[in-house]
Amino acid sequence: MRKVLLVEPVIFIYIFASSLTSPVVQQFIYRKLWEEEYNSTAISSDNSSHCERNKSSPTYVMEKAIQEKTSFFNMQLDLTGAVPSLIVAFIIVANGDHQGRKKSLVLPSIGALIADIFLTIVSYFSWPTSVLFLATFISGLFGSMATFLGGGFAYIADQCHDEKQKTTRIAVIDLIFGVVSGLAGLSSGYFLREMGFTWTFATASLLHVVNIIYITFFLQDTVHISEFQQQAPLSYKEHLKETFSGVYMLFKTAPSKKRILIIVLLFIFMTYLFTMFGGSSLFTLYELDEPLCWTEVYIGYGAAAFTSISLTSFLGVYLFSKCLKDIYIVFIGIFSYIGGIVMAAFAKTTLLMFLVRVPSLFSIMPIPVLRSMLSKVVLPSEQGAVFACIACLEVLTGTISLSVFNVIYAATVAWFSGFSFLLSASLCLIPLGVLCWLLCTSWNGEDLALLVPEEVSSIDSVDS
């Protein structure tokens, strides 16, 4: 059977299925906690959720209490899946340099399938929300989103030999991520309204089945595995040694300039991801609360509005990369995020909340550009190692960020629900400061492209 080097459909299906369930899970938890706490159903209408605005009303106090409980529950759920997925992402993505990229795509898909089956059962049989911790832990054991994206980006990097093409291809994946997650978010409200929780989770499960079949039987690997490797597979101990030695050699044998650049770029990536993930993750809870009081359909509209940010960020990367260095594109993206998140902190009407997306039009640009900058500074044989580091940082940073911001939101929602957004904007000063230092030194974007050819030429001279 002829196989194809087309990973985009895999990413499309996985992101759609995951984004379809993500806002639905938050609403499912919100409603289940309400039922468990007050032995009644959370009320909603066609236009707005039942959201008490009178602060002296007992219902208002009850809603704030459920907001806090939901926030803490989400934090605990994220931590449950983060620890195993952190280890698995590091091992599988780094091993992709020698063992192939398909493992890092198919295993997270299997984990997501198991998690969605659990969600379907919990919803259908009205099991307690505590069962969700088991589903999240199992999903983490299969690598979760970090392993999938790490493998996907490494797969793309393997096919790119031109530096500008690499930046654009990586930006395309982030575009797919944003557009598809927006479309899934938009449709999630209608899925939930027309089909309910159970069939929404079942639909996501079927999508993951399709993905597993495509990856297994139709997707060609970009890493050639020799017949000797297939006949004499490495032991578990040798696998671990190969994994950690690859990442260790990435930093140990590299010139000091390259090593410092990698560390600095990873730090910028990590700090920006921390602020952006943390602030953005609170949107659903913020929109459910008064004075917005959005329903599942409006929450879907809000998620779909994120699509425009992904599209404009991709166009920004495509156009700006023709006339600006990568580092300036990162600057523009961070300032764009700051403008949007500050506006969200004071958004008290539905119109204003939708308009938050306008100043945020380029806020996603730093993510693909920083990935591309890191990919450019390493050798082709080190792509898996660097994307393994990125994947682990994404899991670690994302989990800590979600946990920290959920705790802060729970502690501040009663007196100012927008405080967490202002904190997120303030923390952006950290990556901005490091970028300014990087810009003031001689290590600008042009140096990134010069380091790899020097190493390649030195390796070639040794081989000859």
Curated annotation (Swiss-Prot):
Membrane topology value: Multi-pass membrane protein
Primary site of residence: membrane
Molecular function in Gene Ontology: symporter activity; transmembrane transporter activity
InterPro entries: MFS (IPR011701), MFS_trans_sf (IPR036259)
Protein name: Lysosomal proton-coupled steroid conjugate and bile acid symporter SLC46A3
Gene name of this polypeptide: SLC46A3
Residue intervals passing through the bilayer: 72-92, 105-125, 131-151, 172-192, 199-219, 260-280, 297-317, 327-347, 350-370, 385-405, 419-439
Topology feature Extracellular, residues: 27-71, 126-130, 193-198, 281-296, 348-349, 406-418
Example of a GO cellular component annotation carried by this entry: lysosomal membrane
Subcellular compartments: Lysosome membrane
Protein family (similarity comment): Belongs to the major facilitator superfamily. SLC46A family.
CDD domains per the UniProt record, alphabetical: MFS_SLC46A3
PANTHER family recorded: LYSOSOMAL PROTON-COUPLED STEROID CONJUGATE AND BILE ACID SYMPORTER SLC46A3, ZGC:174356
Intervals, Cytoplasmic compartment: 93-104, 152-171, 220-259, 318-326, 371-384, 440-464
Protein's organism: Gallus gallus
Single Gene Ontology BP annotation: vacuolar transmembrane transport
SUPFAM superfamilies, per database record: MFS general substrate transporter
Keyword vocabulary terms for this entry: Glycoprotein, Lysosome, Membrane, Signal, Symport, Transmembrane, Transmembrane helix, Transport
Role: Lysosomal proton-coupled steroid conjugate and bile acid transporter. Preferentially recognizes lipophilic steroid conjugates or bile acis as endogenous substrates and seems to mediate escape from lysosomes to the cytoplasm. Modulates hepatic cytosolic copper homeostasis, maybe acting as a lysosomal copper transporter and sequestering copper ions in the lysosome.
Highest taxon of the lineage: Eukaryota
Residues spanning the signal sequence: 1-26
Reaction(s) catalysed (UniProt annotation): estrone 3-sulfate(out) + n H(+)(out) = estrone 3-sulfate(in) + n H(+)(in); 25-hydroxyvitamin D3 sulfate(out) + n H(+)(out) = 25-hydroxyvitamin D3 sulfate(in) + n H(+)(in); cholate(out) + n H(+)(out) = cholate(in) + n H(+)(in); glycocholate(out) + n H(+)(out) = glycocholate(in) + n H(+)(in)
Sugar-modified residues: 39, 47, 54
Pfam families referenced in this protein's UniProt entry, alphabetically: MFS_1 (PF07690)
